[in-house]
Every structure is written in structure tokens, then in C-alpha cells.
Swiss-Prot record:
Pfam family, one: NTP_transferase
Full protein name: Glucose-1-phosphate adenylyltransferase
Alphabetized Gene3D superfamilies for the sequence: Hexapeptide repeat proteins, Spore Coat Polysaccharide Biosynthesis Protein SpsA, Chain A
GO biological-process terms attached to the record: glycogen biosynthetic process
InterPro entries the UniProt entry points to: ADP-Glc_PPase (IPR011831), ADP_Glu_pyroP_CS (IPR005836), GlgC_bac (IPR023049), GlmU/GlgC-like_hexapep (IPR056818), NTP_transferase_dom (IPR005835), Nucleotide-diphossugar_trans (IPR029044), Trimer_LpxA-like_sf (IPR011004)
Keyword Zinc-finger: no
Length: 408
């Protein structure tokens, strides 16, 4: 007799404001921010779940969710014949007229989803990191343990670990302590110079999660955060383990991108992650046919290059027209148009951006529908960029918000 597959509900936490990504999140939720030319940030977690065979997915949304809801509804239309779905679930205010108070409160206020489906296990993942992961492998690891909670952890250099939520685990991967950005992070039993950083991805046994959420909801001193409040409950009960992301094998991954994971929650991190895409041997390979990142591709003709020019180490999306210009280490979104003698380098150019003749764009992010007139400059003089109202990150990346015509 065939083994019965357990019932699994996946919940994606997509309600973050993304304040550190402003102005890219001025009019959109953080998971709806474009990435890699044609994708949205949320496409990465949804692709990982779908490729892993986990196709009953609720996406909890909150702030500025229109473009995110629309993207999910149009792009992630799964066949319902076998019970598959990806559905956006806005804040329902079941406990009164208030927003979610934290990630744990978001799930607590959405317990009807869990109660209605009555899954054996609940997968809870974040919506705004860049990585590939076979979630089913982590699920099997959780099931085999018999524990209530499994937390995905990625190995990071111990010297850099203070920037993360850190997992202290014993040699059997049982979590002994969950630390929020500790000054002296603990090393690993098998690598003293490394620490486990939490990836913000969890798998729970249903009854254990529901009980923990009820306990947290009635705790007066809780911030109602999954990592800060709920996971420590499991740790204190000796009911949590860490899943080593290094052990996760994804079909088609190269040795270089096998354990790639990036938090793109700041402008500099977002820019750096894009630069990871454009190398000859990229840090993160979008061209893996065995584990595709799914999205709705722009209905546009192929990119066109005319009047010579050069384009090196650049990702070019459909519908772009590039006319005799020099482009280097750049990601071009759909239908971008760049005129003669312009220069664009180390930049992110989103949908429908127009860059005029003799313009210069250096280490910049141009949101959709931006116009850079003939001869204008972006990213060349940061003081001038700030004077024109543009954001300049600590790492020197200039950001021009959606729909702006760049003044001289």
C-alpha cells in the first residue's frame, strides 16, 4: 500500500512594510518589490514551495497589498482539481479593528485557515529572501524528529553573526537557546568559527503550533513575534531543532550557489543581490531549469540591440531596446529603453524606464516608469542626488522612486 502523504498547509508571511527599502516600498508591499528583471520577491518562496510539492498556500498580507494581491491572483493560478491553491489573505481583524501586532499575531488571527484545513503540519516561511530550497526535505526531517518545531538555519561566519537571530544548538541539532543579535554569538559544535543564523523559515506540528499561538496571544509581555516569542517557547520546552540549510540538496544547483541565501531588506543588500546575478558564473543562478523560479513573464517581444554599443555582464528582460550605449553589470527590467551614447553601470533598471541620449546612470536603482532625460546624471554626484530628493544608501546606491522624471 502506498504511503499516505501528510496534510500540509503552507503559510507565507507577507505583511511587512519594508521601511528600509524605501522608496521602493512607497506604493507596494515589500514582497511585491521587483527582483531580477522579471520577478517579484515573493516568487522565490512560492517557487520553492511549489517545486517541493507543497501547493496549498495561504499568503498573509497587510500593508499596501494591492500590487501583491494582484500579482498572486494573476501569476499563481494553480489547478484546483487536486486541491492546489495560492491565495492572498488580507488582515481580517477577527479580534477587533486593529492591524496585526506581529508575525505570530498574524497567524493567530488566521487560525481559521488551520482549523478549516486541519493539516498534520504547518509550514511558515517568510516572503522576501532570495534562495532555492527543497522544503519537502526539511519537512521530512521535521517529521522524523517527532518534535513540535523545526527552524531552518544557515551557517554564517561567527564574526558576522551578530547581525542575525542566532540559534544555539547541540551536536544533535536540538536547539538550546534562541538569541536575538547577540554580541558574542556561539559557535557550532562542528565549526567553532561559524554560527547558525535563523532563516525565518519554520515547520510545526499543528497541535503544537496552535497551542503556542494561544499561549503567546494571552501573554501580556509578548511582542507576538514568531522568532522572538513563539520559537523560544518551543526551545524552553526542549521541543525545537535546527535544520542545517547546508544539507538541503536542490536539483540543478551548482556548488557555488548550493547554500545561497540573501536577506534583501536594505537598499544595499538588494543592490548586492542583483550584482550576484550578472557574473559569468553568478553567485545565484537564475538559469536552473531543474528548479525554476516561476512568475508571469511580460508579454513583450525579445530584447533588441541596435547601433552597436556594448553590453557586458548584464541581464536583459523582454521588450528592451538598447541603442548604441554602454551597459555594464546591470539588470534591465521589461521594456526599458536606453538611447545612444548613454552609460549605465552597476545599476537596477525596472519596467518601462527610459534613459536618454548621453545620460549617465551609475550604481543606481531606477524604479518603474522613471525617465532620465538626455544628458542627465544619476549616481555620479551624491550631494546633487540628495538635493533632488533621491535616496542615497550608506553604501552609495542612489534610488529614484517610481514615475519620477529626473531633473538636471
Amino acid at each position: 500500500m502506498a504511503k499516505t502523504r501528510p496534510k500540509v498547509l503552507s503559510i507565507v508571511l507577507a505583511g511587512g512594510e519594508g521601511k528600509r527599502l524605501m522608496p521602493l516600498t512607497m506604493d507596494r508591499a515589500k514582497p511585491a518589490v521587483p527582483f531580477g528583471g522579471t520577478y517579484r520577491l515573493i516568487d522565490f518562496v512560492l517557487s520553492n514551495l511549489a517545486n517541493s510539492g507543497l501547493t496549498q498556500i495561504a499568503v498573509l498580507t497587510q500593508y499596501k497589498s494591492h500590487s501583491l494581491d494582484r500579482h498572486i491572483s494573476i501569476t499563481w493560478r494553480m489547478s484546483t482539481m487536486l486541491g492546489s491553491y495560492v491565495t492572498p489573505v488580507p488582515a481580517q481583524q477577527r479580534l477587533g479593528p486593529r492591524w496585526y501586532q506581529g508575525s505570530a499575531d498574524a497567524i493567530y488571527q488566521s487560525l481559521n485557515l488551520i482549523n478549516d484545513q486541519s493539516p498534520d503540519y504547518v509550514v511558515v516561511f517568510g516572503a522576501d529572501n532570495i534562495y532555492r530550497m527543497d522544503v519537502d526535505a526539511m519537512l521530512q526531517y521535521h517529521i522524523d524528529s517527532g518534535l513540535g518545531c523545526t527552524v531552518a538555519g544557515i551557517r554564517v561566519p561567527r564574526k558576522d553573526a551578530s547581525a542575525f537571530g542566532i540559534i544555539d544548538a547541540d551536536q544533535n541539532h536540538k536547539i538550546t537557546e534562541f538569541l536575538e543579535k547577540p554580541a558574542d554569538p556561539p559557535g557550532l559544535p562542528d565549526a567553532s568559527d561559524e554560527s547558525f543564523a535563523s532563516m525565518g523559515n519554520y515547520i510545526f506540528s499543528r497541535e503544537a503550533l496552535v497551542q503556542a499561538l494561544h499561549d503567546d496571544a494571552h501573554s501580556a509581555d509578548s511582542r507576538h513575534d514568531m522568532g522572538g516569542d513563539v520559537i523560544p517557547r518551543f526551545v524552553n520546552a526542549a521541543d525545537a531543532q535546527v535544520y542545517d540549510f547546508r544539507d538541503n540538496e536542490v536539483p540543478g544547483n551548482t556548488e557555488k550557489d548550493a547554500d545561497y541565501w540573501r536577506d534583501v531588506g536594505t537598499i544595499d543588500a538588494y543592490h548586492d543581490a542583483h550584482m550576484d546575478l550578472v557574473s559569468v558564473e553568478p553567485e545565484f543562478n537564475l538559469y536552473n531549469p531543474d528548479w525554476p523560479i516561476w512568475t508571469m513573464q511580460e508579454q513583450a517581444p525579445g530584447a533588441k540591440f541596435v547601433m552597436r554599443g556594448s553590453c557586458d555582464d548584464t541581464l536583459v528582460s523582454a521588450g528592451c531596446i538598447i541603442s548604441g550605449t554602454d551597459i555594464y553589470r546591470t539588470v534591465l527590467g521589461p521594456r526599458a529603453r536606453i538611447e545612444r551614447w548613454a552609460r549605465v553601470d552597476e545599476s537596477i533598471v525596472m519596467n518601462n524606464v527610459a534613459i536618454g541620449s548621453n545620460a549617465t546612470v551609475h550604481r543606481a536603482i531606477l524604479d518603474k516608469n522613471v525617465i532620465v532625460p538626455d544628458g542627465a546624471q544619476v549616481g555620479v554626484d551624491h550631494d546633487h542626488d540628495r538635493a533632488r530628493g533621491f535616496t542615497v544608501s550608506p553604501g552609495g546606491v542612489t534610488v529614484v522612486g517610481k514615475g519620477i522624471t529626473v531633473p538636471y
